[in-house]
Amino acid sequence: MTGSHLPALDAIRGLAILLVTLYRFRLGPDDGMWFEHVYTHVLSLGERGVDLFFVLSGFLITGILFDSKSDRHYFRNFYMRRSLRIFPLYYGVLLGCFVILPIVWPANIQYPFADARELQNWLWLYGVNMRVGWHNDWCFGSFNHFWSLAVEEHFYLIWPLAIFVLSRRSAMNVCVVFGIFALVARIAWLALGGNGLAPEVFTPFQFDALLIGAWLALAARGPGGLAALVPACRLAFPLCLGLLLPEMVLHQRWLTVPST
């Protein structure tokens, strides 16, 4: 398999967008009616759309890295392309909201990004998720969702080196080991009395979704390509559905651990 465009990935990306959008528009606490109860909890499942984004990102980035592994300027090309793709929009938003907007904002109208402005250093340094998780507080207002961008950026910093120095099979093993580590770390964190928000946003706790995508990308580049994964996917689908149903209907996860 090469880095050619896969239309199916656009459908997955669209599904992830739909899930997150539904989650944002879910109802508040229901009034006791059974259909409101189910409706609210089904839409709450849209939170898993972020995990789906992570899986897709891990798949795409790992594919790009593996396919360009023999390039002369492997690291330079990757980081330049990522920077040109991400930084102009990301830092453009921060400049607009924290530098330009305060200059022109009317003094008699409340500034809408005051909370985030006080903590903007975390935004400039891609540390939103660390601040949120450590203090157990969604404290960035309209910028709270930037936590997921921070997780991906941290992944981009370390994963290119892993792909460069490891064989395909070794990299797949790393995906499995550290994916399991992320799961166990979330459980251990809560078992040891850690706050409930950190497992949702801390970078080490979120690597399993990214590594699932990375593992799939590496497996797809082995003998048989994506077709070799079809039997495993047929088994995984009902298993995943069975794990999600309790959350959809009862709002209860099997392992009762965030993002697990």
Give each language-model segment a name:
Residues 10-11, 16:
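Mature N-terminal segment immediately following signal peptide/propeptide cleavage
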Residues 5, 16-32, 36-66, 74-80, ...:
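Hydrophobic membrane-embedded alpha-helices
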Residues 1-8:
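Short, Lys/Arg-rich, polar N-terminal cytosolic tail immediately upstream
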